A protein has these predicted regions:
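Conserved ABC ATPase "signature" region
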Residues: 98, 102, 108-124
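ABC ATPase "signature
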Residues: 211-212
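Short, charged/small-residue-rich alpha-helical element at the C-terminal edge
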Residues: 216-280
Length: 280
């Protein structure tokens, strides 16, 4: 089942075309990566999918229904982390979480559980207005996942985080996905997308330039070559077919082979190849 979809969605801000006939679908239970550099329409797409913006043209569906039909019960199944997500500045981390938990009818024990997973368990008394950008981002994420949403929108969720904290957040997201949460993730971090996402879409100039499973995209755009690294440091290449590989290995009989692998690009290299632009 498609948990959300867009069909030929377009949106302009004045004379600027933000999205131009955008079409894609996300299956329930997957982590879907919406990838591209700043300014290509990733945040705009989330705002459309959460009804913060209305399209000029096209159809949007969430939970299998036109987005205009979503009621409060449907929105209670959604979690959002974005630049527009707010906190109560004069309240502590714990107080912000407690307020949200009370509104959702959640037990206080759930607060401690989530704060532990985002690395804020020892910072519950800190006032929100004094938080660093990274800590604020983790608080907003904690609030977004507190109620175990069916659908989670994450706009650059680890952009301000250090590697250790990023790894912890990735573990949390995998755990939630294993529990049934569908995650729509925007990022310009292709390594993050490769680690987390079942499928990805490359967004460029308001359109989908390419989409697919990361491993399959790497094979699709791989060089038709195989690289053999010998133990003495010498590197050799041959065509990627059984005959050429077999002939090369036969010629190397008696020499120590350290590795044999195809020359597959990473997602960042594929994005550059497909769109002609870098991610930064």
């Amino acid at each position: 089942m498609d948990i959300l979809s867009m069909q030929n969605v377009s949106l302009s801000f004045g004379s600027t075309r933000a999205l131009d006939g955008l079409s894609f679908a996300v299956k329930e239970g997957e982590i879907f990566g919406f990838l591209g550099p700043s300014g290509v329409g990733k945040t705009t797409t989330i705002k459309l999918l959460t009804r913060q913006l209305r399209p000029d043209a096209g159809k949007i569906a969430v939970f299998g229904a036109p987005i205009a039909r979503l009621d409060s019960a449907a929105y209670e199944q959604i979690g959002i982390l974005s630049d527009n997500s707010g906190v109560y500045e004069r309240m502590s981390i714990y107080e912000n979480m407690k307020l949200f938990a009370d509104l959702r009818g959640l037990p206080a024990s759930r607060i401690g559980e989530v704060l532990e997973k985002v690395g804020l368990a020892d910072a519950g008394k800190r006032v929100a207005k004094k938080l660093s950008k990274g800590m604020r981002q983790r608080l907003i994420l904690a609030m977004a996942v507190l109620h175990r949403p069916r659908l989670l929108f994450l706009d650059e969720p680890t952009a301000a985080l250090d590697p250790a904290t990023t790894a912890a957040i990735h573990r949390l997201l995998r755990e939630m996905n294993d529990g049934g949460t569908t995650i729509f993730l925007t990022t310009h971090n292709m390594e993050e997308a490769d680690r987390l996402c079942a499928r990805v879409a490359f967004l460029n100039e308001g359109r989908i330039a390419e989409t697919g499973v990361p491993a399959q995209l790497k094979l699709k755009y791989a060089k038709d070559r195989v690289r053999v690294l010998l133990e003495d440091g010498e590197a050799l290449e041959c065509a990627r077919n059984p005959e050429a590989i077999g002939a090369l290995l036969a010629d190397l009989s008696g020499r120590g082979i350290a590795s044999v692998h195809s020359e597959e690009p990473d997602l960042e290299e594929i994005f550059l190849q497909v769109t002609g632009r870098n991610l930064v």
